[in-house]
Structures are given as structure tokens and as C-alpha cells.
């Protein structure tokens, strides 16, 4: 297959992956963890998945420790956790 044909195939597949929501059965367990700012004093605006509200919300992360339910962008949070 030519490289052009491969690109034509990969483009729609990549778009499908980005636009397909995560089902609750596919959602990583860490998405259920609460927001955790950690003990440090930084002021990083990040996002976490709130499983009660079924949406990604912003919070202030201190910069260390915390947990895996911590995303730099809302898009990354939605792609990983939102159904």
C-alpha cells in the first residue's frame, strides 16, 4: 500500500478514536478517584473527572503527589474518562 493510501486509511481511524466516547466499562479505575491537589504549593490549573457529575472539572493542583485523576487539558480528561 502506498503511503498516500495509508494516510487515507489512518486519518478516519484516528478521527474515530478521538470522537468515540469512553464507555463506563472501558473507563480506567483512576477516573473514579477524587480530585487531589497534593501537599505542594504550586498553582497549576488542571482537570479531573468527577464521576458523580459525569464530567471533567477544573481544579488547582499543587504540583506533587496527588493521584492519576489529573489531566493537563479538558480534552485529555474527556478522552480518557468521560462517557
From Swiss-Prot:
Q: What is its main location?
A: secreted
Q: Which SMART domains match?
A: KU
Q: Where in the cell is it found?
A: Secreted
Mind telling me which SUPFAM superfamilies this protein's record contains?
Answer: BPTI-like
Report the GO molecular function annotations.
serine-type endopeptidase inhibitor activity
Alphabetical list of InterPro entries matching this protein:
Kunitz_BPTI, Kunitz_BPTI_sf, Prtase_inh_Kunz-CS, TFPI/VKTCI-like
Q: Provide a GO CC annotation, any one.
A: extracellular space
Q: Which cysteines are joined by disulfide bonds?
A: 31-81, 40-64, 56-77
Instruction: Kindly provide the name given to this protein in its UniProt entry.
Output: Kunitz-type serine protease inhibitor nigrescinin-5
The BPTI/Kunitz inhibitor domain covers 31-81
Query: Which residue positions hold the site described Reactive bond for trypsin?
Result: 41-42
Which family does the UniProt entry place this protein in?
Answer: Belongs to the venom Kunitz-type family.
Q: In which tissues is it expressed?
A: Expressed by the venom gland.
Task: Reply yes or no: does the keyword Secreted apply.
Answer: yes
Q: Does the keyword Acyltransferase apply?
A: no
Q: Where is the signal peptide?
A: 1-24
Q: Which Pfam families match?
A: Kunitz_BPTI
Amino acid at each position: 500500500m502506498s503511503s498516500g493510501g495509508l494516510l487515507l486509511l489512518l486519518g478516519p481511524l484516528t478521527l474515530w478514536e478521538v470522537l468515540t466516547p469512553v464507555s463506563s466499562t472501558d473507563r480506567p479505575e483512576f477516573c473514579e478517584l477524587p480530585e487531589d491537589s497534593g501537599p505542594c504549593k504550586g498553582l497549576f490549573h488542571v482537570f479531573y473527572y468527577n464521576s458523580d457529575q459525569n464530567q471533567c472539572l477544573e481544579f488547582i493542583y499543587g504540583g506533587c503527589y496527588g493521584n492519576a485523576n489529573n489531566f493537563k487539558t479538558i480534552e485529555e480528561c474527556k478522552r480518557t474518562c468521560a462517557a
